[in-house]
Amino acid sequence: DAWRTRGVWANEKAWFQTPYTTFGQSPDGCSTVMFPKIMGGASANEMLLSGRKLTAQEACGKGLVSQVFWPGTFTQEVMVRIKELASCNPVVLEESKALVRCNMKMELEQANERECEVLKKIWGSAQGMDSMLKYLQRKIDEF
């Protein structure tokens, strides 16, 4: 739900990854709609299909994150921004946020339904279960 909040702040050491295909799952969480809107089709495909890991700086450059802060100053930087938001009229903030979201609601609901149908299909197949079990076994072996 990061893209629906007022701001997305990341620690410099954070990384972002959607390894769906690695464990035999299709994208979910409306990522098939939001990722292309946020970072363009090529970058969205790179993340959703190949599971490419982005650094915090790369995520910021692609619009997935709004600001990146050093670990030592992260809390202080975020608190400054939270105080700024807290000083704003809450009705104005909520109504503005609703205006931004209202046009996307139906599109996101439809995307979520499609993604859930695909997940059911994958999870219900022998190949889908096999992929997930192989992924889990690799993780157990790494542990």
What are these regions (language model features)?
Residues 51-57, 72, 76, 80-143:
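C-terminal alpha-helix plus adjacent terminal tail
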Residues 1-91:
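Crotonase-fold acyl-CoA enzyme core
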